[in-house]
């Protein structure tokens, strides 16, 4: 098939990762090597599990920090250089700013762990049904500016971007090519995560928009 890179998702029933530790990465790395594959991007499950970047309760906050820290270390041992993340979602019964402040704090701490492990964090936006604090480009820019760490970057998710009514060009104009290091590149309408042709996006134009802005990251 010509596939050379994989974005591994640490989630049941694939890879075991929690706030206490993670499975032995050596057999996984050996399988990748045996098949001529690399894992440039590592994604700890952060949507369907209880771990999130803007957790409120002190115990949960620390468990989330340990979980994502373990994800950074796990990814590093598999040869990844990017940890995929999202903004976190805050709580629906509190002001947006409260969840936002916790997300900033979490990413500042995790960015230090990433730096120690030669990893970058790539943060995507979510949909308005998923997050109060990170579904629009201005919110992600605010988060990016407040975290203010060289190991904290952003990524484009075509579905979240489409739902928000944004464009690829807006993202490059807002963040600059050097700060967009990854992409979730799927068809949508505007919701959904579809194979290309099942949604209404223009594949050729989207690729051209990415490449014409100097994008050199992966498409997953």
Name the predicted role of every residue range.
Residues 14-16, 48, 93, 131, ...:
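Active-site-proximal flexible loops/turns
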């Amino acid at each position: 098939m010509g596939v050379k890179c994989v974005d591994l998702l640490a989630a049941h029933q694939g890879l075991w990762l929690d706030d206490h530790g993670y499975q032995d990465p050596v057999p996984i790395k050996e399988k990748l090597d045996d098949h001529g594959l690399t894992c440039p991007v590592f994604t700890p499950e952060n949507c369907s599990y209880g771990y999130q970047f803007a957790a409120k309760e002190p115990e949960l906050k620390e468990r989330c920090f340990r979980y994502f820290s373990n994800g950074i270390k796990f990814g590093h041992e598999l040869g990844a250089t990017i940890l995929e993340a999202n903004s976190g979602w805050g709580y629906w019964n509190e002001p947006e700013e409260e969840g936002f402040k916790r997300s900033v704090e979490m990413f500042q701490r995790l960015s230090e762990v990433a730096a120690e492990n030669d990893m970058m964090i790539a943060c995507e936006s979510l949909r308005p049904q998923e997050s109060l604090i990170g579904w629009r480009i201005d919110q992600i820019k605010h988060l990016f500016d407040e975290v203010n760490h060289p190991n904290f970057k952003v990524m484009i998710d075509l579905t979240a971007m489409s739902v928000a009514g944004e464009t690829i060009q807006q993202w490059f104009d807002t963040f600059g090519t050097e700060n967009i290091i990854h992409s979730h590149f799927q068809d949508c309408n505007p919701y959904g995560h579809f194979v290309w042709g099942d949604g209404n996006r223009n594949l050729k134009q989207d690729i051209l928009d990415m490449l014409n802005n100097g994008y050199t990251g992966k498409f997953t």
